[in-house]
């Protein structure tokens, strides 16, 4: 009986350990994989402001390039590629949250016209799937299927991101028309400088909050500094906290001014946005255009044949 109780207790403990480990894994993985989209999704109903600015620029302060490539025109109910390129020097290392150096991650938000959406898996060709890799896209909101987000993902592997897009069919969606539509994109590489709550990350420069003399610099056990500034005017002391990551530029006894940089700027990433245009083409218009081209070609052929026939008649009359 005692042996049975012991085995039951061991089994219960193992089950609890596995459950706890699984929960930690899920929570950690979710926080890492969703970090980029959640910052924008939680704070903004729409990622693109009325001014045209994409809200990611509020946290990623450095301006960097981004490029998007889409077909000039697509037919209704067709899967096509939207390729977003986020170029950067892959040799660069960024400051991580713990102050150590690591590789840059990338993320992107793609704002499609109404009606355009992520292609379902069964409609994506093997060629496009190969270009996509193991990426997992999601909608910005459940009711905003035309706005897609991805990231953060490793920049070395995914500096070029292929979105599989399904075009709408005006035959089934009456609010969709055969027109030229704009597409907007935002892409970042590296961590941001400001969190959504307005606080600074450790991936930015820290400035002095007072002018005076640096009376003390205390290096923290887990990294970072406490810098004590003695205000020369009233003698009060101000303590500036520097997190792990940025390199210190000042030393004890140094005279500094208000807003003078206390650290270097460790940021090597940045955010960029761009746009493109795509035409939702009417198949009947394409067929009509092809018919017109065929008619022109046939007319040219008949003219050539008629000309040769006329030349033969003229030649025979001259010989006669």
Curated annotation (Swiss-Prot):
TM helices/strands, residue ranges: 286-306
Listed GO MF terms: electron transfer activity; heme binding; iron ion binding
Annotated signal peptide: 1-35
Residues annotated to bind heme: 36, 56, 59-60
Keyword set, alphabetical order: Chloroplast, Electron transport, Heme, Iron, Membrane, Metal-binding, Photosynthesis, Plastid, Signal, Thylakoid, Transmembrane, Transmembrane helix, Transport
Record-stated family: Belongs to the cytochrome f family.
HAMAP family according to UniProt: Cytb6_f_cytF (MF_00610)
Name of the protein: Cytochrome f
Organism for this UniProt entry: Helianthus annuus (Common sunflower)
Gene: petA
């Amino acid at each position: 009986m005692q042996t049975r109780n012991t085995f039951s207790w061991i089994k219960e403990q193992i089950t609890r350990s596995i459950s706890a480990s699984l929960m930690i894994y899920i929570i950690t993985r979710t926080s890492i994989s969703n970090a980029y989209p959640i910052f924008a999704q939680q704070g903004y109903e729409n990622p693109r402001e009325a001014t045209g600015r994409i809200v990611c620029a509020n946290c990623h302060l450095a301006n960097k390039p981004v490029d998007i490539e889409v077909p000039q025109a697509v037919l209704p109910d067709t899967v096509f590629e939207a390729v977003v390129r986020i170029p950067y020097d892959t040799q660069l290392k960024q400051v991580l949250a713990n102050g150590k150096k690591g590789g840059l991650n990338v993320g992107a938000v793609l704002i499609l016209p109404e009606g355009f959406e992520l292609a379902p898996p069964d409609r994506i060709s093997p060629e496009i799937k190969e270009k996509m890799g193991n990426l997992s896209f999601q909608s910005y909101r459940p009711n905003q299927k035309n706005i897609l987000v991805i990231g953060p993902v490793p920049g070395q592997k995914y500096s070029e991101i292929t979105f599989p897009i399904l075009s709408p069919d005006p035959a089934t969606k009456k609010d969709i028309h055969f027109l030229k539509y704009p597409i907007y994109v935002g892409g970042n590489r590296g961590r941001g400088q400001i969190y959504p709550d307005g606080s600074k990350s450790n991936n930015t420069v820290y400035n002095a909050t007072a002018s005076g003399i640096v009376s003390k610099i205390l290096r923290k056990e887990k990294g970072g500094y406490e810098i004590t500034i003695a205000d020369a005017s009233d003698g009060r002391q101000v303590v500036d906290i520097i997190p792990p990551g940025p390199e210190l530029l000042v030393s004890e006894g140094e005279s500094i001014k208000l807003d003078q940089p206390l650290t270097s700027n460790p940021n090597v990433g940045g955010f960029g946005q761009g746009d493109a245009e795509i035409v939702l083409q009417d198949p009947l218009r394409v067929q009509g255009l092809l018919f017109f081209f065929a008619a022109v070609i046939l007319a040219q052929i008949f003219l050539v044949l008629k000309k040769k026939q006329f030349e033969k008649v003229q030649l025979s009359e001259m010989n006669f």
